[in-house]
Structures are given as C-alpha cells and as structure tokens.
Curated annotation (Swiss-Prot):
CDD domains xrefs: CYP64-like
Job of this protein: Cytochrome P450 monooxygenase; part of the gene cluster that mediates the biosynthesis of aculins. The pathway begins with the synthesis of 6-methylsalicylic acid by the polyketide synthase (PKS) acuA via condensation of acetate and malonate units. The 6-methylsalicylic acid decarboxylase acuB then catalyzes the decarboxylation of 6-methylsalicylic acid to yield m-cresol (also known as 3-methylphenol). These first reactions occur in the cytosol.
Protein family: Belongs to the cytochrome P450 family.
Organism: Aspergillus aculeatus (strain ATCC 16872 / CBS 172.66 / WB 5094)
Catalytic activity: 3-methylphenol + reduced [NADPH--hemoprotein reductase] + O2 = 3-hydroxybenzyl alcohol + oxidized [NADPH--hemoprotein reductase] + H2O + H(+)
Enzyme Commission designation: 1.-.-.-
Protein name: Cytochrome P450 monooxygenase acuC
C-alpha cells in the first residue's frame, strides 16, 4: 500500500504545482505597473482588440495611468501614455529602449529582418541609419531636395485643379514622387504610376497585418504555429504574400537603377550613393534592395496620409481656411505660390500642420520598442524583454495636457499651437512639457526623414490653401472624420475615401499654377525618368 500512497501523494503534489503555475502564468507581479485584470495563462490577450487598438489603449491609460502593463501569456507589454516618461525613459535611456521585439510575422515571414522599421538594434541597424541620415540630414534636404519638393507641390495643386474627382490619389502621387526621385531618380508623373500603385497596395496589406493584435501571439505562445492558420485568418499565407510583393517590388526598382548606371547615367540619388559605396558597406543583395525600398515606404505613406487628413479637416472647418487665406494673401499674393522661405511669415500654416499631426497621427501607436535590460520606472519594475508601446494617440488626446486645456482635444483647432512657432525637430531635444507632437516618433527610432517631411507638408498645405477653398462635396457624399468610422484600421492611420470640392480661388492663380508647372517640367522633372 505504501508505494501507492507515495504515488498518489506525488501525483497530487504535481497537480498542485501545475495548477499553481497555470494560475500565476499570465498574472503581473506586484512590483510591475498596474493594468487590466488578467486571466490565468492568457493574461490580457483576450482584451486586446484586433483593430483601432489605440482607442482601447487610451481608455486604459485614463483608468490605469500613463504607464501600465498588459500581460500576453507570460510576456509583458508596457504602454506609455505620458510625455514625461517618454522623455525621461525612452529618450534619456535610448540605448535600453531602442530595441525591437522579435516578431515571427515581420522578421521571419515578411522582411527577413532587413526592414529598418522592425530591424533589431545593432550594427546592421546603425549602418542603415547612418546611410539614411547622410542623405536626409537638414543641410542635404535644403541644398539638394527642396527644389524637387517645390516642383512636386505645384503639380499637386495642378492635379487637384484638373482632376478633382481623384483627390484621394493626388497626395499619394506627390509624396511617392518626391521620395522616388530622391531615392532612385525615378519620379511618379501621374496617379497611374505602376511603382506607386504596387507600393500602396503592399502598404495597405502590411499595415493591416502589423497592427497590434491583428495576428495570433505566436511569439508568446509558439505552439500556436502548429494550429491551422485558417483559424487565424490565414495569417501565414498573407504574410508570405506580402513579403514576396515587397521583395519583388524593391528588387525591380533596384535593377532599374543598376541598369541606368550601367548605361553611364550616374545621378546623385540615395541609391546611387549606396551602390557607389558598396566596396565599403558590403550590403548583401536583400539588404541593398530593402534599404531603398524602406525609404520609399516611409516617405510615400506618411506625408500623403497626413495631407489627406488635413484636407479633410479644412473641408470641415471653413473658418480655418478663411484665416489661412488671409495670411497667405497678405504675404504671397496670387502672382506666385508659397515657397519654403515664406515659412516664418506663414505661422498659421505651420499651426495647421502641427494640428494635423496631433489630430490624426499617422502612427497612433509607435511601432513597439523592446527593453534591452531590466529597468525601474517610477518605482515600478520592467523586466528585460518587455515590449514598450508609446501611445501617441493617447498623449495627443490627453485632456489634461496644456495644449488641450483651452481647446477640446477631439476638435481640429490650429490655434492651440500658437506658442510653437518652430519646426518639429527643434522641440524633440527640449523639455517634454514643450514638445509639440509625437508624429515622428521618439528616441533613436525617430523618423530619419523628419526634415524632408516637414518641408513636404509645409509646401503641400501652403500651396493647396493658396490655390483652393475646400468645400463640402455634393449633398449625401460623406466627409467622415470620425477616428473609427472615417479612418482605416492598421498600424498606419489613413482617412477612408471622403468627399471634398477644391474650388480655385481666382483665375490669376490658375495662370500662376500653369506657369510654375511648366518651369518645374523644364528645370526639375526633366532630370528624372518616370515609373
């Protein structure tokens, strides 16, 4: 009998251990930041929405504070919705917080780890970042890239003027053409450009699958990989298809650049410089294709999405347009369009752009960071490997922040930035209390194209407001700016198709547009091939 008793006792003890482990697995430790109640084993995985995640994350921030912890299985996700913590932790301890969490979907199925957005922090990331910075530093942008931006911005106005029906496509062509001209020497002459349309189809799919919660947590529960992917929306098949599209597009464009160079035509583009320095950098073929492709992605989708959001806001706020028109008319007139040198004399345009960043940020949640080693924040423990998500949406919509104390954070009110006359890069290194917005990200992962993007946005919005009054479309055609029903889900945030009617403000403006467009064709566009 005694062996049976021992066996029974051992089985009971093992069962107790298993039950205890299952009960504690998925629960946060007491020294961690608080958060929503957890369930055994799964933690908070059942609570994280598959779309518009930033809305729920912001609701939790109001309940649990500017730093709270979600548990996904036994893994940790810290959500930061506090400007002070962003500055004192992610910015000041950037060497700890600049890592990326490993992702089976993004690293193994789609990018093979060669995409700058998801790339792990290390020598490869530093090489990519150095090459990008050299070509997009502020002095380079002003000396070499600004004429391209100005020329493409006048075509943007002309596109709205001649083809108002397809107004949703024109900002996409504008930003894609600037980026491709600078990166490859290949501009996008019209909205039918094959490279552009391939890219935006790819980006829509990439954005949807990479949104927090959109795929099963296979990095936390590896056994989920063994289950039929049909249970999870065929995520593996979708991810591999996205990766194949990405590789094919980036390789196709790289080959066009190489073919041009082999014919003796060497330009001063980003990829020309990278290829010329291959003896020193020795980038493998996949990385060589991706370094240009990633720049094409980043420059194409962000400026276009923000332009579309601002035009939508202008359509819904004629009082903002009236104030902008008065400022532009007093400074510029109708015989020429606004240029970059007008920035200091057009402060209200700068306010409109900042408010666009705040009101509808292109990345409502910054792409997740990962903690490189254990850390303590405000007396709370964050273990090594914690995924850190910066909730840009929540910070921008915080009713207690001084930018929002006078004006409703849900409303589009450029005047809230009256005390922020400088460009966004000037506020990044300063005091957290005075930062304007987080549209370009944080820490060492901040957008490397920030200087180019600021010029893209100023020239696009200034010229569009100089030329047009944006009126509502025909009755019954919606201009829905609701953050859920009016915007596409995904980690990139873009307005769904909406109605607007760009009304030219004078015939003299039409003449100016045609004259400046003809000049752009002769002096800028003729430099590049088309694609």
């Amino acid at each position: 009998m005694q062996p049976i008793v021992w066996l029974l006792g051992g089985a009971i003890a093992l069962l107790v251990v298993v039950i205890r482990a299952a009960w504690t697995y998925g629960h946060r430790n007491q020294d961690m930041p608080s958060g929503p109640p957890t369930l055994p084993f799964i933690g908070n995985a059942h609570l994280i929405p598959k779309s518009y995640t930033h809305i729920q994350f912001t609701a939790w921030a109001r309940q649990y504070g500017g730093l709270y912890m979600l548990k996904v299985g036994n893994s940790n996700m810290a959500v930061v919705t506090d400007r002070r913590i962003v500055k004192e932790v992610l910015d000041s301890k950037s060497s700890l917080y600049s890592h990326r969490p490993h992702s089976f979907v993004s690293h193994e199925l789609i990018t093979q780890g060669d995409h700058l957005l998801v790339m792990h922090y290390g020598p490869k990331w530093r090489t990519f970042r150095r090459l990008v910075h050299q070509h997009l530093m502020e002095s380079m942008v002003d000396s070499q890239h600004l004429p391209i931006v100005n020329a493409e911005a006048i075509q943007l106005v002309r596109d709205y003027m001649l083809d108002p029906e397809h107004h949703m496509a024109h900002p996409k062509r504008f930003s894609n053409s600037i980026t491709n001209s600078i990166v490859f020497g290949i501009r996008t002459a019209d909205r039918h450009g094959s490279n552009m349309n391939r890219l935006y189809t790819l980006m829509e799919q990439w954005s949807e699958i990479m949104e927090t919660g959109a795929t099963p947590p296979v990095d936390i529960f590896p056994w989920l990989k063994r289950l039929p992917e049909a249970l999870f929306g065929h995520y593996v098949t979708r991810a591999r298809a996205i990766g194949a599209q990405m590789e094919t597009l980036y390789e196709d464009i790289l080959q066009r650049v190489e073919k041009r160079r082999s014919g003796g035509v060497h330009l001063d583009t980003f990829m020309d410089r990278v290829i010329a320095s291959q003896d020193r950098n020795q980038l493998p073929r996949h990385q060589l294709a991706f370094i240009g492709g990633v720049l094409m992605e980043g420059g194409s989708d962000t400026s276009s999405s923000l332009t579309l959001a601002i035009v939508q806001a202008l359509t819904l706020h004629p009082e903002v347009q009236r104030k902008a028109h008065a400022e532009i008319d007093a400074v510029v007139g109708h015989a020429r369009s606004p240029v970059w040198d007008d920035l200091a004399r057009l402060p209200y345009i700068n306010m409109i752009i900042k408010e666009g960043h705040r009101w509808r940020p292109i990345l409502p949640l910054c792409f997740p960071h990962a903690l490189g080693q254990d850390d303590w924040v405000d007396g709370k423990f964050l273990p090594k490997g914690t995924m850190v998500v910066v909730n840009t949406w929540g910070m921008h919509m915080d009713p207690d922040h001084r930018l929002n104390q006078k004006y409703d954070p849900a409303k589009f009110v450029p005047e809230r930035f009256a005390e922020h006359p400088a460009l966004a890069p000037e506020y990044v290194p300063g005091a957290w209390e005075n930062r304007d917005h987080y549209g370009y990200g944080v820490s060492r992962r901040i957008c490397p194209g920030i200087h180019l993007a600021e010029r893209n946005m100023f020239l696009a919005i200034a010229k569009l407001l100089w030329a047009f009054e944006f009126q509502p479309g025909p009755e019954g055609e919606p201009c829905d700016s609701d953050p859920v029903t009016g915007y596409q889900h995904g980690f990139l945030y873009c307005a769904k198709p909406y109605s607007t009617r760009p009304v030219l403000r004078s015939e003299s403006i039409r003449e100016t547009v045609e004259r400046e467009f003809a000049l752009a064709q002769r002096e800028v566009f003729s430099t590049f091939t088309e694609g």
